[in-house]
From Swiss-Prot:
This is Crossover junction endodeoxyribonuclease RuvC. It catalyses: Endonucleolytic cleavage at a junction such as a reciprocal single-stranded crossover between two homologous DNA duplexes (Holliday junction). Binds 2 Mg(2+) ion per subunit. Its cofactor is Mg(2+). The RuvA-RuvB-RuvC complex processes Holliday junction (HJ) DNA during genetic recombination and DNA repair. Endonuclease that resolves HJ intermediates. Cleaves cruciform DNA by making single-stranded nicks across the HJ at symmetrical positions within the homologous arms, yielding a 5'-phosphate and a 3'-hydroxyl group; requires a central core of homology in the junction. The consensus cleavage sequence is 5'-(A/T)TT(C/G)-3'. Cleavage occurs on the 3'-side of the TT dinucleotide at the point of strand exchange. Belongs to the RuvC family. GO terms for cellular component: cytoplasm; Holliday junction resolvase complex. InterPro entries: RNaseH-like_sf (IPR012337), RNaseH_sf (IPR036397), X-over_junc_endoDNase_Mg_BS (IPR020563), X-over_junc_endoDNase_RuvC (IPR002176). The active site is at 7, 66, 139. Keywords: Cytoplasm, DNA damage, DNA recombination, DNA repair, DNA-binding, Endonuclease, Hydrolase, Magnesium, Metal-binding, Nuclease. PROSITE patterns: RUVC. The keyword Magnesium applies. SUPFAM superfamilies: Ribonuclease H-like.
Length: 158
């Protein structure tokens, strides 16, 4: 089963496809859709086109997306919410449904602590998926973490 993990951001869209086979997880692909600075509607379009490319190049059985987090800047929260809404609509159109996890849920699922740092999460992602090299930027490891969180939830449901 292939799980697509998505980390939407205001500048980039991190994505990761993790294969879940019984209790074993394997990274299939991970990457970043870079959003070029431009007017907002063009940024939305870039993000959706990037998501479309991921769906067209891989078989996806489950989709999980990180929920937006609180930010001090209201404009940032608004922009992230609009990006997430556009992504949610496109995922529903292409796939039918998705699961959402808050950053705290993801951190707790991977490290056991809801207040874990991004570096602690990245360490656990690499350990779980058997990745030896450093993964940058953290948008990519966040997407991997979302996919792993969803895989763990699916295993618990069985």
């Amino acid at each position: 089963m292939n799980i697509l993990g998505i980390d939407p951001g205001s500048r980039n869209l991190g994505y990761a496809i993790v294969e879940l086979n019984n209790s074993h997880m394997k990274l299939i692909e991970a990457g970043l859709v870079k959003i070029k600075p431009s007017e907002f509607q063009y940024q939305l379009s870039q993000m959706i086109e990037g998501l479309d490319m991921v769906f067209s190049s891989h078989s996806v059985d489950e989709v999980a997306m990180e929920d937006i987090f609180y930010a001090y800047n209201p404009q940032t929260v608004l922009k992230l919410a609009q990006f997430r809404g556009a992504l949610a609509l496109r995922i529903i159109q292409l796939h039918g449904n998705f699961s959402a996890y808050t950053p705290l849920q993801v951190k707790k699922a991977l490290t056991g602590k809801a207040k874990a740092s991004k570096e602690q999460v990245a360490f656990m992602v690499k350990k779980i998926l058997g990745i030896k090299k450093e993964v940058k930027p953290l948008d990519i490891t966040d997407a991997m973490a979302v996919a792993i969180t969803h895989a763990q939830r699916l295993r618990l449901k069985r």
